[in-house]
Structure formats: C-alpha cells, structure tokens
Swiss-Prot record:
This is Protein hook. Belongs to the hook family. The keyword Cytoplasm applies. Residues 134-515, 546-577 form a coiled coil. The lineage of its organism: Eukaryota, Metazoa, Ecdysozoa, Arthropoda, Hexapoda. Homodimer. Interacts with microtubules via its N-terminus. Involved in endocytic trafficking. Probably acts as a cytoskeletal linker protein that tethers endosome vesicles to the cytoskeleton. One of its GO terms (biological process) is cytoskeleton-dependent intracellular transport. The coiled coil domain mediates homodimerization. Keywords: Coiled coil, Cytoplasm, Cytoskeleton, Endocytosis, Endosome, Microtubule.
C-alpha cells in the first residue's frame, strides 16, 4: 500500500514537470520550499493565484525552514480558499497537509497530499480540458497513478460538505439538497464508468498481447523446418499426418477461443455502447443540474434583492412616521409663531413706551455723571485728608512722648536745683557757725544730716571740709575762710548760670521740637555735663555715638520697611478702590437691567450719594474722629442694592425654570419640546442695551 502511494506521488512529481516551471522541482527537497508549487498554481488559476500573490512567496529560502513553512502555509491557505470559493467545497482540517513536516523533514506523504490538491485544482479549473489532455498523453503507468490520485480526491470531495449561502424559504433549501444528491449520484456513476473504461482498456491491451503471441506461435508452426521436442524434424504439413491432425485440433480450439473472444468483445461493445448512452444521459442531467443551480443562484439573488427592498421599505415607513411627527410639530410651530408675533407686537408697544420714558430720563444722565465725578473727587480728597490725619496723629503721639520725656528731665533738673540751693544754704549756715566758734570746729560742727544731700553735694561738702581743715591748719585765720567762701560763691554763681541756660534751652526745645530734632541730643549732653560736672566725657561720648548710630541704623531699616509696607498698603487700597468702584458700577447696571423700577431707585441712590457728598465738607473738619464714618452709609446703601439685585436675579431664574417645566409637559412630543422657544428675558435688559 505504501509503495503504491509512493508511486502515485512520484507520478504526480513527473506530471508537475510537464507544466514547464522555472523553479527546480525534480525532487522532494526542491519542492519543499514551495516556489515551484506556487508557480504551478499561478499557471493553473491565474485569476485566483495572481502575480501579486506569487510575489509574496519567497524563492531564495535556502535551508531556512521557517521561510519554507511560511511559503507552504500561504500555498495551502490559498488552495483551501480556492476550493471553498471557486468549487464550493469545504475541505476538512484533517486533510490539511502539514507544512512543518514538508519543510523540516521533507515528508513525501504530506507533499503527495499537497500535490493531490494541486491536481484537483488543475482538473477543475477553467482550462481543465487542456490539463486532462496532457494527462492522457502521458504513459499508461503514469495515467493509472494519476487516475488513482484523482479517485482519492473524488472520495475526499464526496466526504466534504459544500458551503452554500443560507436560503430563507424551505422549498428552495429542499430543491438544493435534492440537486446536490443527484449531482453526487451522477458523479459516482461517472466515476464507476471511468473505472470500467479503464478495465476494458486494460483487457484490450491484454488481448492484443495474446493475439501477438498466438500469431508468433502460428508462424512458428507454419515453418517447414520446425524441429519437434525430441529433436527430429517435423517435416511439411500433409493431409492425414499426425502433425496435420494436431494442428487441425489446435486451429479448431483457437477458432473456438476466437469465437468466445469475439462474443465477449461484442458483449463488451454492447456494454460500452450502453454505458456511453448512460454517460450521455448523465451528462444531460448534469447540464440540467448546472442550469438548475444557475436558476437557484438567480433565485437567491432575487431573494437578496427582495430583502434589500424590504429593508428599504421599513426605512421608508420609519421616515414617513418621522415626517408625520415633523408635520405635527410644524403645525405646533405655526401656532407658536402666531403667539410669538402677538407677543412681539406687545413688546414693540412696550419698547415705544420705554423709549419715551428714556427720552424723559435722558436729561438726568448728565447730572448723574456730574454727581459721580464729584463723588469720586470727594472720595479722593477724603482719602488724602485721612492720610494727613493719620500722619498728624502719628507725629502728635511722637511729640507727646518726647514732651513727656523732656518734662521728666525738666522736673529732675528742677529737683536737683532745689537740692543744690538747700545745700548752698546749709553751707552758708555752716560757714556762719564756723566763724562764731573757730576753736570748736571739728567733726562735731557738721551736724547736718547727709540724707538731705545728694551724693555729688556730699562729696563736694566733704572735699570743702578737708580743704577748710587744711587751710586752718596751714594758714589759719579769717583769710582762709574768706577765700574759701569766695570760691564757693563763685561756684554757686556758675551753677546758677548753667541752670538758667539749661532752662532756656529746655524751653526752646519744647517750642521748636518739631523743627529741630537734633537739639534734643545736644541738650541731653549739656544736661549731663552740668549734672556730672566733668565726668569722663570721652568715654560717655563714644558710647553715646555708638548707641545713636545703632539706633539710627535700626530706625533707618524700620523706616525703609514701613515705607515699603506703606507702598504695598497704598497699592492694595488703590486696587480695593478700583474693585469697589467696579462692584458699584456692576450693581447699578444689574439693577437697571432687572426692572424699570430700578431706574427710580438708581436716581434715589444718586441723590443719596450727592447728599452724602455735600456733607463731606462738614465731616472733613472732624477727620480724626469720624474719618471712617463718611464712607459707611454709602457702603450700606451699595450692599442693599446688591442684595436687591441678587433677589431679583433669583426671581428671574425661578420664573425661567417654571416656564421650562411648563413647556416640557407630558402633553407634547419630544420634538415639540425641543422646538419650544427659550424663556424670554426681561424687557428692561433690552432697554438697558439701547
């Protein structure tokens, strides 16, 4: 069995060589790349296996089995598509050749199955007669193997189920099934007749061979020089001889066999004629079946056309219904247009009335603008005066602090002056007592309480006492006492002059403190000089300079920071004023657009603003106390206006929502609701735009 299959596959390879292919195709390995098979398919059915399809098959693959597998899979897939589309046959996947085995191992069994499929394509293509004649011109052994391969393919076809498009009606499906069964039975009969014809051809060839053999035997016996089996010459044939009798018997037997062969031949001729008639009848039936299949295809096309017409009819019906709905909506729109025309006429009348009112109020616009400008100027003046008052208050507070410091220093100086006077009086008293009892002088003469003197006075008194003692011890007498008294008097006069100058400077500083700030430091230094009486001026001056420089640097930094903060605050105030003015203008516009009655409210508001503007001069006199109160009434008025505008806007939105709910009621269709006009805006908006 395997040998027969191998012979069939070799015969198919030899048949493939008759197609004049350019690619090598002599062995299984040469065919395993798929290039020759693709060229054969392109030559057999160029309308399906086109040149573009052939270009996808790679020819130079070498030993790359992956490219071979890719080529073979493309070929097998194309063959299956050809059988399905062109021949209306669905081949099972079990019969699919294994491309991997062909490419990797060169399996002849799988390659033979692929060649069988290619042979089926050649026998059933448009030029099938050409390929059938090529097969008939081959050798008898090749013809037998190719016929056997065709029989296997026919068995495969009989097992395959044809792929047909589904037919809706039951009658047409039954006709198609019966026609397919008739076609299968006729194909089976044709196959059987072909097998019988092949058998008769083989018998004819065998008979011809036997006739040749018999003719050779007759020629040998007719030879007179024929030698028998025993080596003796049989001699010429004569009547009555044994040789003649043997030959006569042989001739009679051969005649009988010839008659039998002729009768068998006549029987076979009769059978062949009958089979030819049957073949003709079957061919006629096949033609009728082809015509019936064509009619069925036409019927299917008509059914498809009717389906499309039915779908179009449904679409037209739906469109007709939509058009009816649109017509109803159009009628509704006509009614709505009439209502809108009536409303527009009313609106025109109202617009005329509003225009007349606008002409009346046009004269008041100039006054309103003037009042606005005046109000803005007054606001600017008010801001400037407020800034001045703030600065004046700041300077006033600073001056009060400085004045309090100076007063405290003055009080301390006055108290020190009083103490010095008391000390001077006590010294005078002590000197008078010393003059009365000089011999009794000593520490007991100093009966004054030291608690009544300051530290400096005590030190001076002690120093003066020591000097008095020294003078009394050194010189003695009234002369030393008189000199000391004169010195003390001179010092007292100097101290009094210094006190007078210090008091005068304090008064001058209190009067001109705002103009000259540097005199304070000088006064403090002089006061310290008078109080300390020559204490270490250099060290005190250095320390004072360091502290003043440090304080000045701190003050400069604080001033710079305050100036920067002041600039930022000014910018913020300007931006707030701009936003404030914008909000006021927007509130006025909203009130004007909301209702016609807002015009009178705006006029009242302007009157209130003007009245408040006239009162600004009165409030400017009391800037320090009521600077912020001038702006408070206007802010309250504007807040009230913004609140009224907000409530009116809420009423309008509520009205629009109610109109939308009424328009989208259940009594109207969807399209009618979509075509409803939007809720009208208030008429005063149009007036405001004009």
């Amino acid at each position: 069995m395997e040998n027969d299959k191998m012979e069939i596959y070799e015969s198919l390879i030899r048949w493939l060589s008759e197609l004049n292919l350019s690619a090598p195709h002599g062995t299984v390995q040469e065919l395993s790349d798929g290039a020759a098979l693709a060229q054969a398919l392109n030559q057999i059915a160029p309308e399906v296996f086109t040149d573009s399809w052939l270009s996808k098959i790679k020819s130079d693959v070498g030993a790359n089995w992956r490219l071979k597998v890719s080529n073979l899979r493309k070929i097998i897939e194309g063959i299956y598509v050809y059988y399905q589309d062109e021949l209306s046959l669905n081949l099972s996947e079990e019969l699919r050749p294994d491309a991997l085995k062909i490419a990797e191992k060169g399996d002849p069994h799988e390659l033979g199955r692929l060649l069988q499929l290619i042979l089926g394509c050649a026998v059933n293509c448009l030029e099938k007669q050409k390929y059938i004649t090529q097969i008939m011109e081959l050798e008898e052994s090749l013809q037998r193997n190719i016929m056997a391969a065709l029989q296997d393919i026919e068995y495969i076809w009989q097992g395959a189920s044809p792929s047909r498009n589904s037919i809706n009606t039951a009658a047409t499906s039954l006709d198609v099934k019966t026609l397919q069964e008739d076609r299968d039975t006729l194909a089976q009969k044709c196959h059987e007749t072909n097998k019988k014809m092949l058998g008769l051809i083989e018998e004819k060839a065998a008979l011809q061979q036997e006739i040749v053999k018999l003719q050779a035997i007759v020629g040998r016996y007719e030879n007179p020089n024929l030698i028998g089996d025993d080596g003796t010459s049989l001699g010429p044939i004569q009547l009555g001889s044994s040789r003649y009798n043997d030959l006569r018997k042989l001739v009679d037997s051969l005649k009988d066999e010839l008659l039998q062969a002729e009768t068998a031949r006549d029987d076979l001729k009769m059978k062949s004629m009958i089979q030819e008639k049957e073949i003709g009848e079957l061919q006629v039936k096949i033609d009728e079946l082809h015509a019936a299949t064509a009619e069925i295809a036409q019927l299917k096309d008509e059914i498809d056309i009717l389906k499309e017409a039915n779908e179009k009819l449904k679409i037209c019906e739906t469109q007709l219904q939509t058009y009816k709905k649109k017509l109803e909506d159009y009628n509704d729109l006509k009614k709505q247009i009439k209502l809108q025309e009536e409303r527009s006429a009313d609106y025109l009348k109202q617009n005329l009335e509003y225009e007349e009112e606008a002409k009346k109020y046009a004269g008041l616009k100039g006054q309103v603008e003037l009042y606005k400008k005046k109000i803005q100027d007054l606001h600017g003046m008010l801001d400037e005066e407020m800034g001045k008052t703030v600065r004046a208050e700041f300077e006033y507070n600073q001056l009060q602090g400085q004045l309090a410091v100076v007063q405290r220093e003055k009080e301390t100086l006055l108290s020190e002056r009083d103490t010095l006077r008391e000390a001077l009086d006590e010294l005078k008293c002590g000197q008078a007592v010393g003059a009365d009892g000089v011999g009794h002088g000593g520490p007991g003469g100093n009966t004054m309480s030291k608690e009544l003197h300051s530290n400096d006075v005590c030190e001076r008194i002690e120093r003066l006492e020591r000097e008095n003692k020294a003078l009394r011890e050194g010189q003695g007498g009234q002369t030393a006492l008189s000199q000391l008294l004169d010195d003390a008097n001179q010092r007292n006069e100097k101290l009094r002059e210094q006190l007078k100058s210090a008091n005068q400077k304090i008064l001058l500083l209190s009067q001109h403190h705002a103009e000259d700030g540097t005199t304070k430091s000088e006064l403090e230094m002089q006061m310290k000089q008078t109080l300390e009486l020559g204490e270490q001026r250099s060290s005190a001056q250095q320390q004072l300079d360091e502290t003043t420089q440090h304080q000045l640097s701190n003050l400069h930094t604080k001033i710079a920071n305050l100036e920067a903060a002041l600039v930022v605050k000014d910018q913020e105030l300007q931006a707030a004023d701009v936003r404030y003015k914008k909000c006021v203008e927007k509130a006025k516009e909203v009130i004007k657009t909301l209702d016609a009655h807002a015009i009178s409210e705006a006029l009242l508001m302007d009157k209130v603003d003007s009245a408040s503007g006239t009162g600004v001069d009165a409030t400017l006199t009391t800037v320090g106390n009521g600077g912020t109160a001038a702006r408070a009434p206007m802010g309250q008025q504007e807040e009230q206006l913004i609140a009224t505008a907000f409530y009116r806007l809420g009423m309008v939105c509520h009205r629009e929502a109610v109109d939308a709910r009424l328009l989208s009621g259940p009594g109207q269709s969807f399209l009618a609701r979509q075509r409803q006009p939007a809720a009208r805006k208030p008429l005063n908006a149009n007036y405001a735009k004009k």
